[in-house]
């Protein structure tokens, strides 16, 4: 082939849309709950002073049945990554949350008394050449109050690649993304947060104001080869980064064996059928089968209050404060395994998997990784498989086939 004949081919390659496998490092931080506990604050006080529960607003009815509501809060979120908004990108740390569908960050126009806003990074539309005004007001309800602001449109870079933080990991730019500029964050909840905002990765059905979620926009713009994303969360508390979110594929170095998939039972949250929960000491919960949400924005395992109370008793955990249960650290190795059956397959959690070592008042405590919360019918009861489970089992979210995949996570 003559050199001149290579030119048209090269031009075609340059003009073709770029599909990418995007890696976003995840960093582990101390949750709001632990931060407040370590300084003597009470989560009950937080709840009284400012709402923390996730979406409680009504969602427009569709043909697939009722939407689960008030599933969780961000008190226990522990992993964040970095994105950019605007041109040039303004960098923000966000929780990549499969339990919600909206992107929001603090606005430079936040209220004077919004302390949480002033101690986090803020989006400034005047500094972006790709900003498009929208102005529609939005409210995300958190119990008795709401996070509010207005919608804007701009380019979202994943991960953030500003001139001062160029990344060798590759990335994508999602154009014409509508997001929330938060001008009011309720109560004092978000003051203790190590993250600036939230990037929701659930289905469009639960998106506030029917805003197209970032990953859906990314799919429409054909920025990845496969419409899937996967999470590896390191169980090593000192590991940096603390994990990785991959857009467009999976990485076999992060798991052992093969992936096993379950179909999504309701395309709102990433909801799957849970066959049952077995404690090796003989207790069986969710005996007739139940529904579960796979949620990267929650660090704990969450289940109905009465059933989780039985589980805590079976593993010898005693109530502490703020809904937490304590286990004597010297007894952790003797505790029974807990197995979740999903799709007919058992996913075992060892005592080391489902207990958490934390510091409080200068002492090391061991806490149960399970917490009780009732989701009322018709949406509930529901279990939430949070980072305790995802850290043990590499998790793939497949929008092409509407399914969730699990495989035993590798220890790196």
From Swiss-Prot:
Domain spans labelled Peptidase A1: 79-407
Q: Which GO terms describe its molecular function?
A: aspartic-type endopeptidase activity; aspartic-type peptidase activity; cysteine-type endopeptidase activity; peptidase activity
Q: Which residues of the precursor form the propeptide?
A: 21-64
Kindly report the protein's main subcellular placement as a broad class: other
Q: How is it modified after translation?
A: N- and O-glycosylated. Undergoes proteolytic cleavage and activation by ADAM30.
Give glycosylation sites per the record: 63, 134, 263
Q: Which residues form the signal peptide?
A: 1-20
Task: Kindly list the places in or outside the cell where this protein is found, as annotated in its UniProt entry.
Answer: Lysosome; Melanosome; Secreted, Extracellular space
InterPro entries on file: Aspartic_peptidase_A1 (IPR001461), Aspartic_peptidase_AS (IPR001969), Aspartic_peptidase_N (IPR012848), Cathepsin_D (IPR033144), PEPTIDASE_A1 (IPR033121), Peptidase_aspartic_dom_sf (IPR021109)
Residues forming coiled coils: none
Q: Which UniProt keywords apply?
A: Alzheimer disease, Aspartyl protease, Disease variant, Disulfide bond, Glycoprotein, Hydrolase, Lysosome, Neurodegeneration, Neuronal ceroid lipofuscinosis, Protease, Secreted, Signal, Zymogen
Q: Which domain of life is it from?
A: Eukaryota
This enzyme catalyses: Specificity similar to, but narrower than, that of pepsin A. Does not cleave the 4-Gln-|-His-5 bond in B chain of insulin
Q: Name one GO cellular component term.
A: lysosomal membrane
Query: CDD domains from the xrefs?
Result: Cathepsin_D2 (cd05490)
The GO biological-process annotations, alphabetized, read as:
antigen processing and presentation of exogenous peptide antigen via MHC class II; autophagosome assembly; execution phase of apoptosis; insulin catabolic process; insulin receptor recycling; lipoprotein catabolic process; positive regulation of apoptotic process; proteolysis
Q: Which Gene3D superfamilies match?
A: Acid Proteases
According to its UniProt record, the EC number is 3.4.23.5
Tissue expression: Expressed in the aorta extracellular space (at protein level). Expressed in liver (at protein level).
Subunit details for this protein?
Consists of a light chain and a heavy chain. Interacts with ADAM30; this leads to activation of CTSD. Interacts with GRN; stabilizes CTSD; increases its proteolytic activity.
> Hey, which family's this protein in?
Belongs to the peptidase A1 family.
Q: Which disease is it linked to?
A: Ceroid lipofuscinosis, neuronal, 10: A form of neuronal ceroid lipofuscinosis with onset at birth or early childhood. Neuronal ceroid lipofuscinoses are progressive neurodegenerative, lysosomal storage diseases characterized by intracellular accumulation of autofluorescent liposomal material, and clinically by seizures, dementia, visual loss, and/or cerebral atrophy.
What biological function has been recorded for the protein in this entry? Answer: Acid protease active in intracellular protein breakdown. Plays a role in APP processing following cleavage and activation by ADAM30 which leads to APP degradation. Involved in the pathogenesis of several diseases such as breast cancer and possibly Alzheimer disease.
* Protein name listed in UniProt: Cathepsin D
Q: Which organism is it from?
A: Homo sapiens (Human)
* Lineage of origin: Eukaryota, Metazoa, Chordata, Craniata, Vertebrata
């Amino acid at each position: 082939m003559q050199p001149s004949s290579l030119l048209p081919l090269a031009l075609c390659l340059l003009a073709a849309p770029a599909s990418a496998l995007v890696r976003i490092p995840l960093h582990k931080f101390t949750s709001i709950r632990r931060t407040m506990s370590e300084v003597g604050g009470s989560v009950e006080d937080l709840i009284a002073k400012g709402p923390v529960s996730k979406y409680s607003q009504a969602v427009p009815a569709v043909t697939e049945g009722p939407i689960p509501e008030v599933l969780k809060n961000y008190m226990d979120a522990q992993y964040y990554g970095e994105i950019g908004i605007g041109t040039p990108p303004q960098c923000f740390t966000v929780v990549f949350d499969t339990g919600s569908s909206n992107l929001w960050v603090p606005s430079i126009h936040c209220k004077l008394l919004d302390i949480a806003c002033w101690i986090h990074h803020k989006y400034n539309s005047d500094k972006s050449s790709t900003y498009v005004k929208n102005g529609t007001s939005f409210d995300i309800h958190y119990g008795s109050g709401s996070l509010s602001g207005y919608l804007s449109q701009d380019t979202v870079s994943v991960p953030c690649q500003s001139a001062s933080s160029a990344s060798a990991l590759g990335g994508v730019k999602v154009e014409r993304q509508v997001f929330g500029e938060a001008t009011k964050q309720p109560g004092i909840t978000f003051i203790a947060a190590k993250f600036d905002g939230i990037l929701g990765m659930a289905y469009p059905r639960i998106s506030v104001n029917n805003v197209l979620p970032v990953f859906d926009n990314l799919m429409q713009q054909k920025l990845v080869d496969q419409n899937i994303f996967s999470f590896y969360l390191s169980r090593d508390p000192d590991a940096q980064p603390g994990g990785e979110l991959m857009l467009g594929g999976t990485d076999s170095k992060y798991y052992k064996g093969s992936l096993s998939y379950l179909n999504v039972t309701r395309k709102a949250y990433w909801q799957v059928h849970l066959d049952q929960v077995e404690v090796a000491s003989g207790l069986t919960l969710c005996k007739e089968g139940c529904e579960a949400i796979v949620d990267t924005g929650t660090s704990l395992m969450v289940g109905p209050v009465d059933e989780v109370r039985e589980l805590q008793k079976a593993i010898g955990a005693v109530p502490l404060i703020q809904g937490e249960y304590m286990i004597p650290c010297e007894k952790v190795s003797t505790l029974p395994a807990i197995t979740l059956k999903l799709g007919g397959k058992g996913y075992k959690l060892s005592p080391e998997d489902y207990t958490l070592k934390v510091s409080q008042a200068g002492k090391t405590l061991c806490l149960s990784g399970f917490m009780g919360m009732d989701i009322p019918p018709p949406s509930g009861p529901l279990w939430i498989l949070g980072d305790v489970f995802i850290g043990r089992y590499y998790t793939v979210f497949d929008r092409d086939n509407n399914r969730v995949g699990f495989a035993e996570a590798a220890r790196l």
